[in-house]
Regions:
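Acidic, glycine- and histidine-enriched catalytic cores of nucleic acid- and nucleotide-handling enzymes
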Residues: 1-37, 43
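Charged substrate- and nucleic-acid-binding regions of tRNA-handling and nucleotidyl-transfer enzymes
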Residues: 1-5, 24, 207, 213-298
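A residue-level signal for conserved active-site and pocket-lining positions in enzyme catalytic cores
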Residues: 15, 20-23, 74-75, 147, ...
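A generic alpha-helix surface/boundary motif
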Residues: 20, 54, 123-127, 247-253
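Amphipathic alpha-helical segments within well-ordered protein domains
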Residues: 23-24, 42, 61, 127-134, ...
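Short, well-structured alpha-helical segments
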Residues: 38, 42, 72, 89, ...
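Double-stranded RNA-binding/processing signature
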Residues: 46
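Conserved, hydrophobic alpha-helical core segments of structured domains
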Residues: 49-220
């Protein structure tokens, strides 16, 4: 049982951050908060407005990476959330309450747990929450990217939304993708390469890890995601080009071939990358320069 030493209201008045620590200890240790202590939390919650956002963020992050991250619900039930930030307070409304479903299988890493907590938010809303709490720019970028892509089907696999709305339908959808994987592997790999090209390798790995955790309640969907993980490994093992840096030609090559320096160089390289994502065999300097030359002549 979590309780204060002495009078709870006095302890929380001395340092309002203790109200968040009480909830964090509850999540870390699995203990319940004693009734009088909880009542004092509700009463002293407005004092949290006087605590620096950095200190508030540290407690919320520790809560989210705890063994019981879903206990962040208590931050809302005790009336603390309005005193964190307006956008933070609205997260349950935006998500329909699903923000409190944070599978313990999601790795206890700051960016992953924050992303899962805010996965129903728009990326810009997630950024507002994290900036208000003074999180570092790298974490904000990682969370924003994950929030943007968690709800997207990469290659036709069921998303968390489709699983929640129609689990049987999601299982059927997963079955179709499984057949596609066995018959049209190249088409699926093209889609996966495109998705991989949109973010850093580590972030893409985090995205698949999170998607897999959120698909656990639908085994066929989870099986599809494991198959996509295997395809990802195959793409990397084969050295398939998935970024501008991996292209066999560079901007300098295009300029030497006669193209004027400027935005057009970047545009052409992006067009070439799209062709190579479809078929990695095309990624040779000779082929790509001849292709660009024929386009210029036309």
């Amino acid at each position: 049982m979590i309780r204060c030493v002495g009078a709870a209201e006095e302890r929380f008045t001395e340092d309002a951050l203790r109200i968040l620590r009480a909830i964090r200890f509850s999540a870390q240790l699995g203990f319940e908060i004693e009734e009088h202590t909880e009542n004092a939390i509700k009463k002293i919650a407005p004092n949290l407005v006087h605590v620096s956002r950095e200190r508030v963020q540290v407690e919320l992050t520790k809560l989210l990476i705890s063994p019981l991250p879903g206990r962040i619900r208590q931050v809302y039930e005790t009336g603390i959330s309005p005193w964190v930030s307006e956008t933070f307070h609205r997260i349950p409304e935006i998500s329909g309450g699903s923000c409190f479903h944070i599978p313990s299988s999601v790795p206890a890493e700051k960016s992953l747990r924050w992303a899962v907590f805010m996965r129903k938010c728009e990326p810009k809303e997630a950024v507002l929450v994290l900036k208000a709490l003074k999180l570092d720019n790298d974490t904000i970028y990682r969370v924003k990217t994950l929030v943007q892509w968690i709800k997207v089907s990469l290659c036709g696999e069921p998303t968390e939304d489709s699983i929640q709305s129609d689990k049987d339908g999601a299982a059927i959808q997963a079955g179709y993708l499984k057949k596609e994987l066995s018959k049209h592997n190249d088409r699926i790999k093209t889609g996966l390469r495109r998705a991989m090209s949109r973010m850093e390798p580590e972030l893409f790995d985090d995205l698949l890890r999170v998607k897999l955790c959120l698909a656990e309640e639908c085994p066929p969907a989870a099986e599809c995601l494991r198959a996509l993980c295997c395809l990802r490994d195959e793409i990397r093992r084969d050295g398939d080009c998935i970024s501008l840096k991996m292209l066999a030609v560079t901007g300098n090559d295009l300029i030497k071939a006669g193209m004027k320096p400027g935005k057009e160089v970047g545009t052409r390289l992006q067009q070439v990358l799209e062709l190579v994502l479809e078929d990695p065999v095309r990624n040779t300097k000779e082929y790509l320069l001849s292709l660009l030359s024929s386009v210029s002549d036309a």
